[in-house]
Design a protein with these regions (language model features):
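Surface-exposed patches in mature extracellular/periplasmic domains of secreted proteins
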Residues: 62-72, 114-117, 135-143
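An acidic, glycine-rich "communication" segment
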Residues: 28-30, 38-39, 47-48, 121-198, ...
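Aromatic-Pro/Gly-enriched surface loop or interdomain linker
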Residues: 21-83, 89-90, 181, 189-190, ...
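Bacterial N-terminal signal peptides
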Residues: 8-18
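Alpha-helical scaffolding within the catalytic cores
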Residues: 66-73, 95-101, 166-169
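Short alpha-beta junction capping motif
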Residues: 31, 83-122
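Positively charged n-region of N-terminal signal peptides that target proteins for export
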Residues: 1-5
Length: 225
């Protein structure tokens, strides 16, 4: 089962970036977190990606590395990672060279998951518009396959942390072939639920819901090819 699953992963990512592909696969390099300037607390809860990898490995029978990898949008090693995560509480700022590199990476197979940890919405929307001025963030409802590809979230995006009583929303940016290049979750704070139990004192059922949705993100990416 594990061998077949990882073969599917490699094949899917190769198809996504066939023009000039991202060289890494999540099975080999794992997930990465994006470091950025602007003071937006990019580094909070460093355990969340390792915890997601552990959870995915336990339920998907995968073998993702349990690492906290950090990249900047300007780094050449960005192309080693097909899955990059960004979060924070405040301002994100990308330099022009970072915007260009990030655009190239996403067009060549990279996937960016952005989770607003309350306070980064305005700056993320501004900066991602610089990356893709010709594209829009499209709201995704529960009919989008990611919501039901592994665990059933047909009732909609779960609310993990309450900030200001707004409904949780998911948005996507797609390439010309309909491939999801960027997922942005707002007013839910999914990734806080991936933290260690002592970090936010979330009850087990809340953490499990967050990790299940994270598992859906991973499964959707590796099975869509």
């Amino acid at each position: 089962m594990k061998t077949r699953f990882l073969t599917l992963l490699v094949a899917s990512l190769a198809l996504c970036g066939a023009l000039y592909p991202v060289t890494g696969t999540a099975a080999r390099t794992g997930f990465a977190r994006m470091q950025y300037d602007g003071g937006g607390d990019w580094y909070n809860d460093p355990e969340i990606l390792p915890n997601l990898a552990r959870y995915a490995n336990s339920v998907l029978n995968t073998d993702f590395p349990i690492d906290q990898n950090v990249v900047k949008a300007s780094d050449a090693k960005l192309f080693d990672y097909p899955f990059v995560f960004i979060t924070g509480h405040g301002n994100i700022r990308w330099e022009d060279r970072e915007v260009e590199n990030l655009r190239n990476w996403m067009l060549r197979g990279g996937f960016l998951y952005a989770d607003d940890d309350y306070g980064m919405d305005q700056s993320f929307r501004r900066e991602i518009k610089r990356v893709f001025p010709e594209l829009e963030l499209v709201e995704l409802d529960s009919s989008f396959p990611l919501f039901t590809c592994f665990y059933d979230f047909s009732a909609g995006l779960p609310k993990i942390h309450e900030h200001d009583a707004k409904p949780p929303q998911a948005f996507g940016i797609f390439d010309e072939n309909g491939r999801l290049m960027c997922l942005y979750t707002y007013e839910t704070n999914i990734s806080d639920g991936w933290a260690d139990p002592a970090t936010h004192k979330d009850p087990p059922e809340v953490r499990d819901t967050a990790l299940r949705f994270g598992c859906n993100i991973v499964y959707y990416l590796i099975s869509r090819g």
